[in-house]
């Protein structure tokens, strides 16, 4: 559920040390949006979203979007 995901993302954000913007990007990834869609929704450049993604992947020690989504829904 959306509420459960939000609670889990907050926990993971604290544990992994995500910034609030990185957490926003992570949340939107979990909803299935593309990088370009995330950029538009958050009013960021596509490049900035990619940078956030790299940092998120590093903090969670994952290498792919599917791994991140799987982790978020655990």
Describe each model-derived feature in a short phrase.
Residues 27, 40, 70:
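A cross-family signal for key residues in well-ordered alpha-helices
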